[in-house]
């Protein structure tokens, strides 16, 4: 079983206390409680920049978690860590897996778009404008999906879509 950690951050301590109370009062199975504990410990480790520890906890949480909605957030967080580590192919894989279980994760679509946009910029630097355009088009598709789910968000993406004439807004 993972160790529960409390750091000096008041909000982290408070949310940890609330999570422990909820685990005791909400009717859940032993497996669900273990999965949540691993997920919580993964979030704590991730917030402290301990990505290896966070991944270990998230992988264990995915092994135990049976609810697709809850699994989607675990997979999304694994994608975040791979993005932070510059492992974009792995990150995209985990964002896709998260969206398979929960298609209403605009942040996953946004992060996928950011990766595609970055790859488009890299293709430009390598002198391959055709590949760059393909990456930018893919980024546009992902941003459109994120914006459709949360129209008031992703203003920079909306501006980029307008400037590049990839999407017209009303």
From Swiss-Prot:
<keyword id="KW-0802">TPR repeat</keyword>
<feature type="repeat" description="TPR 3">
    <location>
        <begin position="120"/>
        <end position="153"/>
    </location>
</feature>
<feature type="repeat" description="TPR 2">
    <location>
        <begin position="72"/>
        <end position="105"/>
    </location>
</feature>
<dbReference type="InterPro" id="IPR019734">
    <property type="entry name" value="TPR_rpt"/>
</dbReference>
<dbReference type="InterPro" id="IPR011990">
    <property type="entry name" value="TPR-like_helical_dom_sf"/>
</dbReference>
<dbReference type="Pfam" id="PF00515">
    <property type="entry name" value="TPR_1"/>
</dbReference>
<dbReference type="InterPro" id="IPR022818">
    <property type="entry name" value="PSI_Ycf3_assembly"/>
</dbReference>
<keyword id="KW-0793">Thylakoid</keyword>
<feature type="repeat" description="TPR 1">
    <location>
        <begin position="35"/>
        <end position="68"/>
    </location>
</feature>
<comment type="function">
    <text>Essential for the assembly of the photosystem I (PSI) complex. May act as a chaperone-like factor to guide the assembly of the PSI subunits.</text>
</comment>
<dbReference type="GO" id="GO:0015979">
    <property type="term" value="P:photosynthesis"/>
</dbReference>
<comment type="similarity">
    <text>Belongs to the Ycf3 family.</text>
</comment>
<protein>
    <recommendedName>
        <fullName>Photosystem I assembly protein Ycf3</fullName>
    </recommendedName>
</protein>
<keyword id="KW-0602">Photosynthesis</keyword>
<keyword id="KW-0934">Plastid</keyword>
<keyword id="KW-0150">Chloroplast</keyword>
<dbReference type="InterPro" id="IPR051685">
    <property type="entry name" value="Ycf3/AcsC/BcsC/TPR_MFPF"/>
</dbReference>
<dbReference type="GO" id="GO:0009535">
    <property type="term" value="C:chloroplast thylakoid membrane"/>
</dbReference>
<keyword id="KW-0472">Membrane</keyword>
<keyword id="KW-0677">Repeat</keyword>
